[in-house]
A protein has these predicted regions:
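Asparagine/serine/threonine-enriched low-complexity, disordered tracts
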Residues: 8-10, 17-19, 26-28
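Histidine-centered, transition-metal-coordinating active-site segments
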Residues: 33-112, 116-122, 129-130, 162-366
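Short, conserved acidic/polar surface loops in the N-terminal third of protein domains
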Residues: 93, 144-151
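Active-site-proximal cofactor/substrate-binding loop regions of enzyme domains
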Residues: 111, 124, 131-143
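Post-HEXXH active-site segment of zinc metalloproteases
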Residues: 131-135, 148-161, 229-233
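Short active-site segment of divalent metal-dependent hydrolases/proteases
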Residues: 143-144, 218
Length: 366
């Protein structure tokens, strides 16, 4: 099936500013006069694959800003994401299992870090831009809701439309504040990779394609690992053990190696037909036996109720939202529904439960 570009109205695939052209009109300075950033940029131009994205040739940012003397544009984007509030909140957002009692289950933050590790391994092996890859990986899930995909589904129902990838872009473009201004002002390449990371879309760069496929590798394998630890399943079917590997690490290694072998010196990131088919079948096994099991379903109904009641309250009491969100509404052309969605999507699991309690659970008054 042919992949498509994500049709997000807040994202322009082409920057109209001529200073952001794909070809840099400025020659690389002589090495004697180079600062640290320029040496990085020269190294990328001379040593990375012809298919790699180069910081010097970036299409640039929506708002022009002075260059850093030490870091390339992609390195700066990575750091801006890493230091953002939205990134820190990922540690208290569900990956699959809601508020597990054990300390070793994945959260949305640990998932993000595993995607980053897998992505960087592939990018380095293919001689692509590791900094760009890391920035996209760290930012790809910033827009995820509390309570995992359950939260996403109920917000989609309530708002008629919600996609976590589009919300992630909205976070870095609007909701994060940097130097007193909305948005992190990231480069085109990072924004494109964040928006188009779901596997049905096609990022503009190979680095973005790496994150897209690494996201699937990460969640399939770590969700199996967590499901076995939580006694939801005892193991996976024999054919996956035989062809992909008998351990968590072996399966990840098989998938990564297959991608590297099939993508080397090519302008696309692909798996072999055999491993791609097995990966898809393993994902189907997860949906049937883990994501939609009876225990998960019972907890899912509770979390959907929490999100639905919070949304219902603020549609009737919009001015009760935190001042930050009311100000966004007053200073922009967004609907109240969009602002309420922004507020709920940014919540952690425990904050959503706290808000629900404050709104609906009576407190002793004597």
């Amino acid at each position: 099936m042919k992949k498509q570009r994500c049709p997000n109205p807040i994202f322009s695939a082409r920057c109209p500013n001529p200073i952001f052209s794909a070809r840099c009109p400025n020659p690389i300075p002589s090495e004697v006069n180079m600062n640290i950033r320029e040496k990085y940029e020269q190294f990328e131009m001379e040593h990375l694959s012809e298919y790699a994205s180069k910081a010097l040739l970036s299409k640039g940012r929506m708002l022009h800003e002075p260059k850093c003397e030490i870091r390339t544009d992609f390195q700066r984007d990575r750091d801006r994401i890493l230091h953002s509030k939205s990134f820190r909140r990922l540690k208290h957002k569900t990956q699959v299992f809601l508020s597990p009692e054990g300390d070793h289950y994945r959260t949305r933050l640990t998932h993000t870090l595993e995607v980053s590790q897998i992505s960087r391994t592939i990018a380095r092996s293919l001689n692509l831009n590791e900094d760009l890859t890391e920035a996209i990986a760290l930012g790809h899930d910033l827009g995820h809701t509390p309570f995992g995909h359950t939260g996403e589904r109920i917000l989609k129902k309530l708002c008629n439309e919600f996609k976590h990838n589009e919300q992630s872009l909205r976070v870095v473009d609007i909701l994060e504040i940097r130097n007193g201004k909305p948005g992190l002002n990231l480069t085109f390449e990072v924004r494109d990779g964040i928006l188009n990371h779901p596997l049905k879309y096609e990022p503009a760069t190979l680095e973005g394609q790496i994150v897209s496929i690494s996201d699937r590798i990460a969640y399939i394998n770590h969700d199996i690992d967590d499901a076995i630890r939580g006694h939801i399943i005892t193991n996976i079917p024999d054919k996956f053990l035989k062809h992909l590997g008998s351990s968590h690490g072996q399966r990840i290694n098989t998938m990564i190696l297959d991608i590297i072998q099939n993508s080397e010196n090519k302008n696309s990131i692909i798996m072999s037909d055999e491993v791609a088919t097995l990966t898809t079948e393993l994902r189907d096994f997860l949906f049937e036996n883990v994501y939609y099991n009876k225990i998960a379903k019972s907890e899912e109904d509770k979390t959907m109720f929490i999100v639905e009641k919070i949304y219902e309250y603020y549609t009737k009491n919009f001015d009760s939202l935190p001042e930050f969100y009311v100000n966004i509404y007053n200073n922009n052309n967004f609907s109240k529904k969009e602002i309420i969605k922004d507020y709920i999507a940014g919540m952690t699991d425990r904050y959503a439960m706290k808000v629900f309690e404050e709104l609906y659970i009576p407190k002793p008054w004597l």
